[in-house]
Amino acid sequence: KVSYEQKPFRREVMRTYGATVTPSPSMETEVGKRILEKHPGTSGSLGCAISEAVEKATTTEGYRYVLGSVLNHVLLHQTIIGLEAEKQMEMAGDYPTKVIACFGGGSNFAGITFPFLRHNLTAGKTTEFIAAEPACCPKLSQGKMMYDFGDTAGTTPLIPMLSLGSDFQPEQIHAAGLRYHGGGQIVSQLVQDGYINSVAIPQDETFKAGILFARAE
């Protein structure tokens, strides 16, 4: 819901291509109604949206739902990003000492870091990997390792992950795609094993850093 309200041009692009766009949680699904009853006034979360999407897909003939982050096959698919970055570094004759990426559920972070991280595991490299997560949703920094659901309503299979709890309702921030309660299972295990560090950053600090970077560049 927060993205629906904050980013009107995105929904207009979708509507241009014929989509019907509904903010989540909504009154259009049973799970949406339950979430709104339990959390009146909530701005929603990725977990809420997943629950509603799963219900819609499973109750509409001919439709399937595919999770776009968190799960291992998604994280590994995204590594094309890091493989390209690795090749670019090779062409430049350099190699990173640190790799930093934002972290919501893990697909973006895994995509850029995993190709480099394998060299720490197999070739003795000492690159540092830092997951930057929002302070309002610090699943890697403060979450507990558990088997948890990937959505608010508990419709997905249980997933081993660092999690704040599938019922966690994060506060409203601009980067709505990072407002997810858990981390992908491979990333969660690598955090537990000490291969990945995490840092939880407040939104205001992020904006200040973005402005500094833009002006310095």
Map each language-model feature to its residues.
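Active-site-proximal loop->helix
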Residues: 1-43, 139-152
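Short glycine/serine/threonine-rich phosphate/pyrophosphate-binding segments
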Residues: 5-8, 102-113, 139-141
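Alpha-helical scaffold elements adjacent to nucleotide-binding pockets in ATP/GTP-utilizing enzyme cores
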Residues: 9-13, 84, 115
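Buried hydrophobic positions in well-ordered alpha/beta secondary-structure cores of metabolic enzymes
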Residues: 14, 53, 85, 99-101, ...
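Active-site/ligand-binding loops adjacent to catalytic centers
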Residues: 34-73, 93, 118-121, 126, ...
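A glycine-rich, Thr/Ser-enriched phosphate-binding loop motif common to dinucleotide/cofactor-binding enzymes
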Residues: 69-84
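Short Gly/Thr/Asp-enriched flexible loops that form oxyanion-binding sites at enzyme active sites
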Residues: 85, 109-119
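Short helix-loop-beta connector
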Residues: 91-97
